[in-house]
Regions:
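Pre-Walker A (pre-P-loop) alpha-helix and adjacent loop at the N terminus of AAA/AAA+ ATPase modules
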Residues: 24-58, 63
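Conserved alpha-helical scaffold flanking the Walker A/P-loop in AAA+ ATPase domains
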Residues: 47-49, 104-123
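Walker A/P-loop
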Residues: 53-89
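Short beta-strand-centered segment that lines the nucleotide-binding/catalytic pocket of NTP-utilizing
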Residues: 82-94, 151-155
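AAA+/SF3 P-loop NTPase mechanochemical coupling elements
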Residues: 111-120, 149-166, 177-186, 264
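Conserved AAA+/SF3 P-loop NTPase catalytic/coupling segment centered on the Walker-B
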Residues: 118-143, 157, 172-181, 193-201
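Conserved AAA+ ATPase core "coupling" helix
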Residues: 174-229
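C-terminal engagement/docking regions of AAA+ P-loop ATPases
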Residues: 253-333
Length: 333
C-alpha cells in the first residue's frame, strides 16, 4: 500500500482524543473492492480515496487506454453512487454539462433538464480537448457543489466527486487548463503503463468476463458523506501545520518558479493529510503523511519559468528539492 515510510513518532505529540469514530474497515473495503477490477494500481486507488475523503477532486494526466474510465466506474460502483461521463470536445457547450431549461408546450412552462453534472461521480474525459469557456463551467460545481442556470441555483448530489482526465500537453489539439481551474483539483495523478506481470493479470482477469459487471457496492453515498464529515475531526498539530506552511512558502520563494502554491494548496495538503491518516487508521496526522502527499497535491499548481520549461525541468523536480531541504519535524518531549 501507499505511504508506509512513516516516522516513528510518539502518539502524544500528534493525537487528540476527541471521540472520533471512523469506520476504517469501510475505507479498506472500498479500496479492496476497486482492486477486484483494477490491477496493480494500489497507489492510484489510495490517492483516489484520499481525494474522495478530503471532499476534493482529481486530475488524471495520462494517455488513452490506461484504465481511467474503468477506475472511475469502479469507484462509483464501490460507493453505490451514480456515475456520468462527459467526453469533452471542441464543440461542447457549458449547458451540455450543467443542464438547460426546456420549454414545455403543453404546460406553457420551462422545465429544467438535468445535466450530467447531477451525479455522484463525474468523469470529465479529456477535459483539455475543449475550449476554456466550457472548461470553466465546471468551476462553480467543483467549488460550490451547485450549478446556476438562468439565475436559478440547483444543488448537486452529495458526495460530488470530479475525476477529470487530460492528455499530455505535448499532444496536438489540446487547450491547457488555466491556473484557476488547475488549482481546483486537490490531486493530480498518473496511472502509467502496467508492468509485464500486471498486464498478463489484466488479460487473465478480463479473459472470460468483465469484473466490473459483477462488482457490488462496498458502501453507500451516505456513508461516504459521513466519512467526509468525520475526516474534518482528524487532529493536525501545530508542528504539522508549520511543516505544511514551510513547504508551501518555499515554492513561492523558489526563483525558478513563476507561480508557487497558493493558500488553497496549503489547505489541500492539510485535508489530504487528514484523509490519509483516516485510511491509515489514525486520528492524527504525521509529518510523513504530508511529505508523501506534497507532489500529488502541489505539482500541478506550480508554473515554471520559461527557461526552466525549455530545459525540460518538471515541477516535481523542484518539489523533491524542497522536500529534501526542509527537515521533517521530530517528536517533542
Amino acid at each position: 500500500m501507499l505511504f508506509r515510510n512513516e516516522t516513528n513518532l510518539s502518539s502524544n505529540d500528534y493525537i487528540r482524543f476527541g471521540g472520533i469514530k471512523l469506520d476504517f474497515s469501510l475505507c479498506k473495503r472500498i479500496i479492496e473492492n476497486i482492486s477486484h477490477v483494477i490491477v496493480g494500481k494500489n497507489q492510484s486507488i489510495e490517492l483516489l480515496l484520499v481525494a474522495l475523503l478530503a471532499d476534493g477532486h482529481v486530475l488524471i494526466e495520462d494517455l488513452p487506454g490506461l484504465g481511467k474510465t474503468l477506475l472511475a466506474k469502479s469507484l462509483a460502483r464501490s460507493i453505490g453512487g451514480s456515475f456520468r461521463r462527459v467526453q469533452f470536445t471542441p464543440d461542447l457547450l457549458p449547458a451540455d454539462i450543467t443542464g438547460f431549461n426546456v420549454y414545455n408546450q403543453q404546460t406553457g412552462q420551462f422545465a429544467f433538464q438535468l445535466g450530467p453534472v447531477m451525479t455522484n461521480i463525474l468523469l470529465a474525459d479529456e477535459i483539455n480537448r475543449t475550449i476554456p469557456r466550457t472548461q470553466s463551467s465546471l468551476l462553480e460545481s467543483m467549488e460550490e457543489r451547485q450549478v446556476t442556470v438562468d439565475g436559478k441555483t440547483y444543488p448537486l448530489p452529495h458526495p460530488f466527486f470530479v475525476m477529470a482526465t487530460q492528455n499530455p500537453i505535448e499532444l496536438e489539439g489540446t487547450f491547457p487548463l488555466p491556473e484557476a481551474q488547475l488549482d481546483r483539483f486537490l490531486l493530480k495523478i498518473r496511472l502509467g503503463y502496467p508492468e509485464k506481470e500486471e498486464e498478463i493479470a489484466i488479460l487473465e482477469r478480463f479473459r472470460e468476463k468483465d469484473p466490473l459487471i459483477e462488482l457490488e457496492a462496498a458502501a453507500s453515498p451516505e456513508q461516504v458523506a459521513e466519512l467526509q464529515h468525520t475526516r474534518k475531526g482528524i487532529h493536525i498539530s501545530h508542528i504539522v501545520q508549520e511543516y505544511i506552511t514551510n513547504i508551501v512558502r518555499a515554492t513561492r520563494e523558489n526563483t525558478s518558479l513563476r507561480l508557487g502554491a497558493s493558500p488553497r494548496g496549503s489547505l489541500g495538503l492539510m485535508r489530504a493529510g487528514q484523509a490519509l491518516a483516516a485510511l491509515r487508521e489514525r486520528e492524527y496526522v504525521l509529518p510523513d503523511d504530508i511529505k508523501s502527499l506534497v507532489i500529488p497535491v502541489l505539482a500541478h499548481r506550480l508554473i515554471l519559468k520559461e527557461e526552466e520549461r525549455l530545459r525540460g525541468t518538471s515541477p516535481e523536480h523542484f518539489l523533491e528539492e524542497i522536500i529534501n531541504q526542509i527537515p521533517v519535524p521530530a517528536p517533542t518531549g
